[in-house]
Amino acid sequence: MVYIFAIKSPVYGGQGAYLAYQIAEEVLKAGHQIKQIFFFQDGVNNANRFVNPANDEINLVQKWQHLAKSKKLALHLCISAAQRRGIVDQQTSTDSTNNLADMFILSGLGDFSRAVLTADRLLTF
């Protein structure tokens, strides 16, 4: 099966984003494909490279990055939601700084919609 994950849960402050990560791992272990992971609303905070949890806490940003790199997954971020919440890359930044974590890319709802049309399942967290 081909899955799309839509994540609107923040990186911390709830269990939604971590649950999405855990389910993504299990979906892949079961031999299914994840075509796209799309972060929107408060979920865009999962892509903030300045997230710095305590040493005894899970760094979910790093977990998403590792999963994307090791499984060659696309981590898409809603550009509108990201800009509203201060998540920017070099191109959208008003100065020379950016806080978009590696492996995440800014994209629009059109990319998400096209991916959904080709998937068997859409999971929202």
Swiss-Prot record:
Enzyme Commission code: 2.8.1.-
Active site: C78 (cysteine persulfide intermediate)
A cellular-component GO term for this protein: sulfurtransferase complex
One Pfam family, short name: DsrE
Localization: Cytoplasm
Entry keywords, A to Z: Cytoplasm, Transferase
Coiled-coil residue windows: none
Record keyword Transmembrane present: no
GO BP terms, alphabetized: tRNA wobble position uridine thiolation
Function: Could be part of a sulfur-relay system.
Protein family: Belongs to the DsrE/TusD family.
Protein name: Sulfurtransferase TusD homolog
Source organism (scientific name): Haemophilus ducreyi (strain 35000HP / ATCC 700724)
